């Protein structure tokens, strides 16, 4: 896929994920060698949720991430642009809402915290998406972004790039109902900002005090920030 193809129409992206919903969770576990479960747990811990807080899980997909967040005792809402993905998680006992990350169907200052896992890349204008997440978060509320990032060990980074370019697309063709979604994944990861670059973008688009924690040598980074009080 050419780099220009990453500028997909939002409805094309939603349709692509509609097609992979049924086997999405299993495919992710296989392709991440089981690390996806660890990353979900660390995201919950990083967000530091309290019982009774109201939390938005944006780009929640099949709501497997929302169920993990709900272990904290917080009230969690799964929101995704793909109806097919949400339908694939219909048996997961959390609230589910279809919504566009650039026009969220929630009032201002609705949530104590918001998180988005591996979906910020898929928002057509991710900067507008960051501002929209800030809009629906209460002043002083928290953001955690879990996203694929830049490995911090050079030798490992070389191996990882080889995996993205060659092995991941081949593996996706073997286990996924729509391999194109994972080819898009590999290309969009390579085009994504580094940890420091993303932190700057977050601080410039509705949030402050952004820092990050690397997971699995930087394959994934958890960026956390606060919505200013004023």
UniProtKB/Swiss-Prot annotation:
Gene3D superfamilies reported in the protein's UniProt record: Vaccinia Virus protein VP39
Pfam family, one: Ubie_methyltran
InterPro entries named in the record: SAM-dependent_MTases_sf (IPR029063), UbiE/COQ5_MeTrFase (IPR004033), UbiE/COQ5_MeTrFase_CS (IPR023576)
Function field: Methyltransferase required for the conversion of demethylmenaquinol (DMKH2) to menaquinol (MKH2).
Catalyzed chemical reaction(s): a 2-demethylmenaquinol + S-adenosyl-L-methionine = a menaquinol + S-adenosyl-L-homocysteine + H(+)
GO biological process, one term: menaquinone biosynthetic process
Protein name as catalogued: Demethylmenaquinone methyltransferase
Listed EC numbers: 2.1.1.163
Signal peptide: none
Keywords of the record: Menaquinone biosynthesis, Methyltransferase, S-adenosyl-L-methionine, Transferase
One MF term in the entry's GO annotations: demethylmenaquinone methyltransferase activity
Binding of S-adenosyl-L-methionine, residues: 62, 80, 100-101, 117
Keyword S-adenosyl-L-methionine attributed: yes
Stated family: Belongs to the class I-like SAM-binding methyltransferase superfamily. MenG/UbiE family.
SUPFAM superfamilies listed in its UniProt record: S-adenosyl-L-methionine-dependent methyltransferases
Functional pathway: Quinol/quinone metabolism; menaquinone biosynthesis; menaquinol from 1,4-dihydroxy-2-naphthoate: step 2/2
Record has Kinase as a keyword: no
């Amino acid at each position: 896929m050419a780099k220009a193809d990453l500028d997909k129409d939002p409805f094309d992206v939603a349709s692509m994920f509609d097609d992979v919903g049924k086997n999405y969770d299993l495919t992710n576990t296989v392709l991440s060698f089981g690390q996806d479960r660890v990353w979900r747990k660390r995201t919950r811990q990083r967000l530091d949720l309290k019982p009774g807080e109201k939390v938005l899980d944006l780009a929640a997909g099949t709501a497997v991430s929302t169920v993990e967040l709900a272990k904290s005792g917080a009230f969690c809402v799964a929101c995704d642009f793909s109806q097919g993905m949400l339908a694939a998680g219909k048996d997961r006992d959390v609230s589910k809402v279809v919504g566009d990350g650039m026009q969220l169907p929630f009032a201002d200052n609705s949530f104590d915290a918001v998180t988005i896992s591996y979906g910020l890349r898929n928002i057509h204008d991710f900067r507008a998406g960051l501002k929209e997440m800030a809009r629906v978060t209460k002043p002083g509320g928290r953001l955690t972004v879990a996203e694929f990032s830049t490995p911090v060990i050079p030798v490992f980074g070389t191996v990882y790039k080889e995996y993205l370019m060659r092995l991941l697309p081949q593996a996706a063709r073997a286990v996924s109902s729509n391999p194109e979604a994972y080819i898009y994944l590999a290309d969009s990861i390579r085009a994504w900002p580094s940890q420091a670059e993303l932190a700057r973008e977050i601080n410039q688009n509705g949030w402050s005090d952004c820092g990050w924690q690397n997971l699995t040598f930087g394959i994934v980074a958890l960026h956390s920030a606060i919505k200013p009080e004023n």
